[in-house]
């Protein structure tokens, strides 16, 4: 009886907190345990967004660097991104925060049920970020960018996309297999079908949990969003929803800097004998081999020093991508791969390329139905701009707005992308009929 009274009290607090705009502390973890819900909260905290920009440890996780690049419009009439005036990652992030310096967010880390690469049941983790006060407008389902250390997993930090919470949106951000509670497993990097399934399973777990908590959004359509690895993944999530007629209404998809053609992206490392982001070479290879259960011996393709340190540098989840790049110590692809790994005609590489092709969203027999905003910097030094041009050619009949231009390197492009999405969301608030201002 006492337990039921506590649950009723919690629900009352949630209802008043989510809909009346009052700042009330609610123990979501206690509620999730009491109700035996689909999403079990393991940690909860409230974060002041302005404090983030003054936190050097948080900033350094996103590779804060200076650059002299300035946004320029591309040729061919493609619209430029909404411009942030700063030319540094830290500066653009500050501009993101300046929209609402007093904003606060409630972070809920938790676990949910999904499946692994063998289709066996597994518990995965992720984070939900809610406005600390006021109603929730819509959900934004985020597919995160490439990470390497477990401390970068969304359940363990405040993800960069989480800054959008200040506009009144609730963000759902899965960790993926290999991070969070499954950090002991190899991450099936860029294996699209399973990752899209894992992302959607978190959405299906979180929605009924928040409904029980009285925190349903004002609108029942959602946004999808992702940059880099997340850009390709969010398109795979859109495909999963539309191809299988899942009961999710997509308002718009925001995709930035994505490797939509995985084989082409990887092959550029081989063709140019240069990898500006060297950790991507072993991470992509391992993701394809493990995630697709290929019968390949990676030691025949990876240079011995890379293969021998793979578990320590990559699979331990101790190091960030920047730290792994420093440990690798070279950007010359032939120093990362064996002659067999550099030989596109070898049996091993042919099988690897086949898996990459099958996981490339551009090889799917599908055209996006929901509106898409696609962003890519022509200066991207990690994911070649050609990916975006191939997407534009493949999906020429789709409802896609393109934003291509000189927006800086891959990292700066990420922050500009989020800045642009924020501007589009603000426009969307004013134009609920679906017409977006650029």
Q: Residues of each region from the PLM?
A:
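Short beta-strand/loop motif that positions the catalytic acidic residue
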Residues: 368, 373-380
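C-terminal catalytic histidine-bearing segment of alpha/beta-hydrolase fold enzymes
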Residues: 348, 353-355, 359, 379-382, ...
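Alpha/beta-hydrolase active-site loop
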Residues: 189-212
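Catalytic-loop region of hydrolases
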Residues: 21-134
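C-terminal motif of bacterial Sec signal peptides marking the signal peptidase cleavage site
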Residues: 14-17
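Short, surface-exposed "cap/lid" segments of acyl-processing enzymes
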Residues: 116-125, 129-167, 182
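Accessory cap/linker subdomain of secreted extracellular hydrolases
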Residues: 60, 256-364
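Primarily recognizes the serine-hydrolase "nucleophile elbow" in alpha/beta-hydrolase
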Residues: 204-276
């Amino acid at each position: 009886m006492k337990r039921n009274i506590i649950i009723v009290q919690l629900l009352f607090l949630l209802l008043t907190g989510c809909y009346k705009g009052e700042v009330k502390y609610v123990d979501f973890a206690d509620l999730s345990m009491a109700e035996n819900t689909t999403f079990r909260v393991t940690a909860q905290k409230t974060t002041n967004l302005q404090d983030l920009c003054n936190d050097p440890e948080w900033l350094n996780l996103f590779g804060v660097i200076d650059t002299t690049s300035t946004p320029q419009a591309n040729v061919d009439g493609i619209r430029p991104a909404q411009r942030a005036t700063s030319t540094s990652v830290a500066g653009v992030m500050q501009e993101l925060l300046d929209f609402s310096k007093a904003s606060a967010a409630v972070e809920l880390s938790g676990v949910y049920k999904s499946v692994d690469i063998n289709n066996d049941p597994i518990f995965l983790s992720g984070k939900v970020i809610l406005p600390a006060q006021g109603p929730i407008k819509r959900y934004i389902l985020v597919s995160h960018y490439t990470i390497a250390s477990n401390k970068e997993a969304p359940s363990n930090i405040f993800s960069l996309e989480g800054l959008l919470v200040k506009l009144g949106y609730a963000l759902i951000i899965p960790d993926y297999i290999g991070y969070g509670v499954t950090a002991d497993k190899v991450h099936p990097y860029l294996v699209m079908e399973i990752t899209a399934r894992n992302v959607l399973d978190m959405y299906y777990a979180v929605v009924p949990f928040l409904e029980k908590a009285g925190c349903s959004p004002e609108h029942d359509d959602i946004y999808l969003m992702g940059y880099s690895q997340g850009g390709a993944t969010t398109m795979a999530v859109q495909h999963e929803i539309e191809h299988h007629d899942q009961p999710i209404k997509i308002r718009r998809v925001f995709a930035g800097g994505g490797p939509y053609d995985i084989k082409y992206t990887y092959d550029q490392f081989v063709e140019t004998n240069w990898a500006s982001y060297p950790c991507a070479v072993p991470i992509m290879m391992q993701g394809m081999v493990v995630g697709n259960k290929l019968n390949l011996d990676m030691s025949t393709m990876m240079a011995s020093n890379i293969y021998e340190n793979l578990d320590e540098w990559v699979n331990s989840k101790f190091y960030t991508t920047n730290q792994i790049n420093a440990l690798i110590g070279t950007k010359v692809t032939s120093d990362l791969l064996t002659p067999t790994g550099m030989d596109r005609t070898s049996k091993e590489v042919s099988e690897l390329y086949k898996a990459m092709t099958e996981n490339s969203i551009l090889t799917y027999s599908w055209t996006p139905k929901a509106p898409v905003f696609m962003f890519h910097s022509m200066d991207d030094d990690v994911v070649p701009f050609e990916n975006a041009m191939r997407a534009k050619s493949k999906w020429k009949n789709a409802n896609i707005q393109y934003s291509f231009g000189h927006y800086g390197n891959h990292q700066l492009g990420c922050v500009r992308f989020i800045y642009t999405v924020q501007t589009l969301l603000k426009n969307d608030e004013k134009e609920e009929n679906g017409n977006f201002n650029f």
